Amino acid sequence: MPHQQILMLFGLLPVATNISTWWNFGSMLLACLTLQLLTGFFLAVHYTANINLAFSSIIHITRDVPYGWMMQNLHAIGASMFFICIYIHIARGLYYGSYLNKETWLSGTTLLIMLMATAFFGYVLPWGQMSFWAATVITNLLTAIPYLGSTMTTWLWGGFAINDPTLTRFFALHFILPFGIISLSSLHILLLHEEGSSNPLGTNSDIDKIPFHPYQTYKDMLMLTIMTIMLLTIVSFFPDIFNDPDNFSKANPLVTPQHIKPEWYFLFAYGILRSIPNKLGGALALXMSIMILLTLPFTHTSKLRSMMFRPFMQLTFWTFTATFLVISWTATKPVEPPFTTISQVAALMYFLFFISNPIMGWLENKIMKL
């Protein structure tokens, strides 16, 4: 009976007829979250949060634990899949004006911040060379905060340098944050269904709706199958494709890597941080690169919701997408010309997208006499 009720609930959930594949990434994110929780639990069972044993415990998981290599690779590559899906999900929201559903957008941006924090803490756990130095660089940014900076950094580290207490608390945070993500995801979905999904046209969907099941369930299953095939192909044939070679060496505080860089999904934020020569300015720009998403629902001036019928805004959006990729590319390069100049121009263009959004909306209204 409960099974029938669940099916009936999905059957009665009305969805716009014309929503495209770009609306499938929400369910894919839910699948990624489930995968991360399951693999993460099995990894946590065998992991040791100690600076002398952490690196060895990862080697032990991959070599000695039955299917440990698969768990470790699924967890690491699953994180990359998670970020691919969330960036596409956000891009869809930007393009089709989904951010006008304010509560859903604000809860989603908070989810992104929590996800980035969780991924950062997780990257430190293997205690490889890049893990250690990435943690050193990013946590050191707290010292840029006037008056409180040094105290906050010491408090976060649990001492006067990154050491055993730092790793222990990072493991605790990496374990607890996903439960917050689950709670907020539930709220995100609840808030979404208060109003219902938007559609590519940006019009009111009430006039033409179909049941979620079987139409959208099959559509979701297709995309989930494609994602699973991609994930298992990478895990089986290219497990180290996203790994940094430096992270195969145990952390050594006495040797600095030639080029410190985070995982690929943080490169855009790291590129913006590096493009500003001032420490406090860089730290503020880093935070603002994410927080600026919160401004979108309040700066939308166009009478049209979606960018589908806004050619100027489409051009701006695709320029923004290219800018995102350029910043990510420059963040992998050393801090020297011409990369410094390119990253500074790209960082400026990144923020210009959000500034130009209300201006373009106003301009389009004038041209179309809306």
Swiss-Prot record:
Signal peptide: none annotated. Keywords: Electron transport, Heme, Iron, Membrane, Metal-binding, Mitochondrion, Mitochondrion inner membrane, Respiratory chain, Transmembrane, Transmembrane helix, Transport, Ubiquinone. PROSITE patterns: CYTB_CTER, CYTB_NTER. Its cofactor is heme b. The keyword Metal-binding applies. A ubiquinone binds at H193. It comes from the Eukaryota. The chain crosses the membrane at residues 25-45, 69-90, 105-125, 170-190, 218-238, 280-300, 312-332, 339-358. It is a multi-pass membrane protein. Binds 2 heme b groups non-covalently. It is found in: Mitochondrion inner membrane. Heme 1 (or BL or b562) is low-potential and absorbs at about 562 nm, and heme 2 (or BH or b566) is high-potential and absorbs at about 566 nm. This is Cytochrome b.
